[in-house]
Amino acid sequence: MTLSMKRVTGSWCSNFLYKGMSDVTLEKLVSLCKRRGFIYPGSELYGGLAGTFDYGPLGVALKNNLKQMWWKQYVDDRDDMFGLDSAILMNSSVWEASGHTDVFNDPIVDDTTTGARYRADHLLEDNGIENAEALSLQQMTDLIKEKGIKSPEGNPLSDVRTFNMMFATRVGARDSDDATTYLRPETAQGMFVNFKNVVDSFYPDLPFGLAQAGRNFRNEISPREFIFRTREFEIMELEYFVREEDWEKYFEMWRNEFFIWAENIGLDAKKIHELDVPSEELAHYSKRTIDFEYEFSFGTKEIGAVAYRTDFDLRNHSKHSGVDLSYMDKHTNERFIPHVIEPTFGLDRNLFAVLAESYREESLEESNEKRVYLSFKKEVAPVRVAVFPLLKNKPALVEKAREVFSSLKKQYGRVVFDDNGNIGKRYRRQDEIGTPHCVTIDFDTLDDNTVTVRDRDTGKQDRVALKELTQALS
């Protein structure tokens, strides 16, 4: 059940009462992201390319913060995890062994008038048919005819058929079938084919995991909802190797870990719902999967998952490659193929959820002004602190502001210097990009070494001694 995303808060600031809400539409987020340099349409100069987006300076900073937090939490701070960065291009036999060349398909229909293609399950869901992806191709075709469903342009639709979503490409100068490979549709296979390499290099005890964050490519028929469903995206993924008899224990462990992660990046646990995927909808490699879905304004959608992949991948790669991928327990001398728990975190989707969660609008009770701000956690915010000279045409103020800026830059890294426009406009600009604190250097600073520190969420301004500034910003 989707709950209301509306939240009302109030706080006193400069004698004005702010009335705020986090009820954000997709249109508002898209507008803010482009205006403030988070995310731009891909190839916009040439009319764009559907399903592609470019991350601007603030967007890539936000994405890197999330990625670094994830890596620290699941690799650096653990003693049972090994990081990898496998190639995007892989031998095509990898995808044959994994099953992707046969079953990595989506159901599609054609507009019989224009030739435009659409995801059949999406059209059915848009017309009130729930869990359409669990239906067979024939069931989808029958429902489209029975319900009289048309294309978005109002034209008749073809029968439903499958479409393989992998991007094929050629390797080298040869134009032959054996030169064909694919842009990877998932990061997982790069970890499975390196399982033996890591075991031979590090001799880890079970359970242990491999971690990877990287780009994936899927030829989506109907990219939609901004960066939620795109043709190029980043996934942060773990493959956790366990004994078969222990899979349920570690499945629950990683199930709980998702909520710890969500809290760390600032998501409201009440807006995250678990979907225990029905058996008929499971991926070909999975025996059990739980999707973690977040309440976006356009619906409750998946942003992560935990799957029990059994020994499907290692067993199939062992069979197709002819290489023994079993594991030798050095304590018991047992040899067996480990089973796998796979926690998956969609980086772009997690970022999208953080943007939606953080968006606030506030109107001043005593004026018609509206304030928009992003209530990022400090660890997530692309800019940690902004430093202002009160006036840009006063060299003494600018010099002192530069001195404070340099000091904070060494401590936090993500610090900006801003002297463009009046102080109110600078505050609003930093609010919209989610900067937690602004530090203003004024004439009093020159006399007593104090500065004004403004809090983003409350708008409250405090006078702070420079020697206590780090503590005030923590």
Which residues fall in each region the model found?
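N-terminal amphipathic/basic-hydrophobic helices that include classical n-h-c signal peptides
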Residues: M1-G20
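NTP/phosphate- and nucleic-acid-binding module
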Residues: S14-S474
